[in-house]
């Protein structure tokens, strides 16, 4: 569990807060470890729950992760050190599926999720070039920000049903602040099964489209290409069937590589 890793951090000066429903059994688990449990005030999405956490805490730095991760012991230490630089408003790192706890399907899903060409440019599996690399977006499961910056932008977009980290980072950068990635600060993030991933991808496509409508500058050529993928698949299938019904490519000279036909 995430709480186990947070209980054994090399950086000791941390306050761990878990946000959830008032009657959730997670309260007992959280408090048994000496951590603080915060009522989510009826939040229906991650964005609103994160805003509750920001309002109910006072630390200079705010770290975000999820409940389905394995937190390395030096996670906080690796990210916290960069805030000594004034140009760092937020910093994060890559997230990968834990090798020893993932089946072949989850490993395959991890490869897809960590490839920027298959995810319209996201950097969830991006290994920074050099010690620290400036980026446009931080993974919500592995990120830290200065509180003053979060308060300046007004926190996460209230009511956002997804892509809340994308929109937050976009607004932070619009104000001239800079975000960075430390490729060594890896978070081990458990991947879902195939059936749940299908639903996750469908939902992500929806929320990313909504985010693009709210902030048009978030919509890039890569998102248009991904949106066109179903059309391209249907077109390819139709042309394949048409070719089969019509005897395939009837260009014998095209396929003939004998010396008589090659100039």
Stretches with model-predicted labels:
Residues 4-13:
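Short, acidic, metal-binding catalytic loop of nucleotide-sugar glycosyltransferases
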Residues 40-57, 129, 133:
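Glycine-rich, basic loop-to-helix element that forms the pyrophosphate-binding segment
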Residues 62:
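Short aromatic/hydrophobic "clamp" motif used to bind/position activated sugar donors
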Residues 66-70:
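The conserved acidic donor/metal-binding loop of glycosyltransferases
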Residues 74-107, 111:
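Conserved donor NDP-sugar-binding/catalytic core segment of glycosyltransferases
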Residues 99, 157-219:
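Catalytic donor/gating beta->alpha subdomain of glycosyltransferases that bind UDP-sugars
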Residues 115, 119-144, 161, 167, ...:
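A recurrent flexible, glycine/aromatic-enriched loop bordering the glycosyltransferase active site
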Residues 229-263:
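Membrane-embedded multi-pass helical conduit in multi-pass membrane proteins
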